[in-house]
Amino acid sequence: MKRSAGIGLAMALGSLTLPVTSMALEFSGYVRSGAGTADGNGRQSCFQLPGARSKYRLGNECEHYAELDLRQDLFTLDDGSVLSIEGMAQLFNEYGHTPKFTGDHGTARMNQMYAEWSNMPALNGGSLWAGRRFYKRNDIHISDFYYWNQSATGFGIDEMKIGDYKYSYVFSRKDSYDQKEYINRHDFNVGGFVTNPGGEIEVGVSYIDKPSSVEDSNSGWAVTGQHVQKNFLGLSGDNKLALQYGEGPGTGLGYTGDPTLDRGAKSWRVVEFFDFQLTPRLGGQVQAVYQKDKREDGGDQDWWSVGGRTSYAFTQQFKLVGEIGHDQVDASGGTRKLSKFTVAPTWSPNGPGFFERPEIRLYYTYATWNKAAQEAANLLAEGSALSDTGAFGSARNGSNFGVQVEYWWK
């Protein structure tokens, strides 16, 4: 696998030397880094409720992380279509450990490396692609929750227009770093259903083959429908409402789930969030998520998450940012609860808007959780912030203080 990846990278780099009349090189990326302490004693420990699929991230991230992306247009053909390649390096390292980006506390990998033939007249402006790429990633910014994500290693047709609608298909074998087995997955999407001025619906279906390499495995499927409303309520932001359902391995919803689950395993999810920029200085994002998991082995659980982040700029470059979030998981063993609050004085040299970056933040985070959450952490996440072997011991509350920089660019 390493040898084939190396050959692919060499071919991609070699293609940059081809004689072409016009080659546009684009460099984009994302970086966050910082340092923090838990209650002023020891390295920062982040708060996430066992069973919750995400956490509220402001002042609650415990890693250095970077994505560095290069995209190169190789040829523009006579029909207007474009041949391109794209590669992205990903770097990750936990706080409190030397940033080697390898070993038990860090990683370095190519999380994108693919070729694309875009704007094809034969596909009415659609594209063909092959490789490993980010694709149709739908996420909530304040919790970094990728609820519908078709990123994968495979090939696909992207947004071929037929009439008023755009059709996409992806065949993939692996859709996340944590997926151990290669499993065939098919994703079909149709978009462009106009519902109202500024509003559209996109629908996607995923089918996951039964893998022959996994004992007692099963096939599965999932469906997602999402409505996107531009300029929601005149607040200069978007609203997204997604409804999701899956069975068997399809219970991963946005991802390939456990292939040993049969069709008796089911998951439902509702995602609702919106951005707003009420004035040039006042903006934010609010979210609500509900997920119900039904398992035949008694592992049923319900997850609720409600929260929001708001920023107010006192000057063109100084913001005060606040975030509050609550997660609750109803499962065997009791109802787990976690509430978290963060306040962050922030320098924003590019302006006062909510999404303007870079930001350099000082932050204070306080969280509180109940006994059921602590007992679940003892069992499922020993040594984590909520467990009695973590940074806060037997207490069921704790705080972090630190500094962080976040920056993205295109």
Predicted regions and their residues:
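Transmembrane beta-strands of outer-membrane beta-barrel proteins
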Residues: 25-33, 76, 81-89, 126-130, ...
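Surface-exposed coil loops of outer-membrane beta-barrel proteins
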Residues: 34-36, 40-58, 97-111, 122-214, ...
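Hydrophobic, lipid-facing positions within transmembrane beta-strands of outer-membrane proteins
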Residues: 64-68, 110-113, 151-155, 184-188, ...
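Detector for outer-membrane/organellar transmembrane beta-barrel domains
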Residues: 195-210, 216-331, 337-341, 347
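Beta-barrel outer-membrane channel/assembly domains of diderm bacteria
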Residues: 2, 9, 13-124, 160, ...
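Solvent-exposed loop segments that connect transmembrane elements
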Residues: 43-51, 179-181, 213-216, 246-263, ...
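Transmembrane beta-strands of outer-membrane beta-barrel pores
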Residues: 33-39, 74, 89-95, 132-136, ...
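Short sequence motifs at beta-strands and strand-loop junctions characteristic
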Residues: 58-64, 104-107, 147-149, 180-182, ...
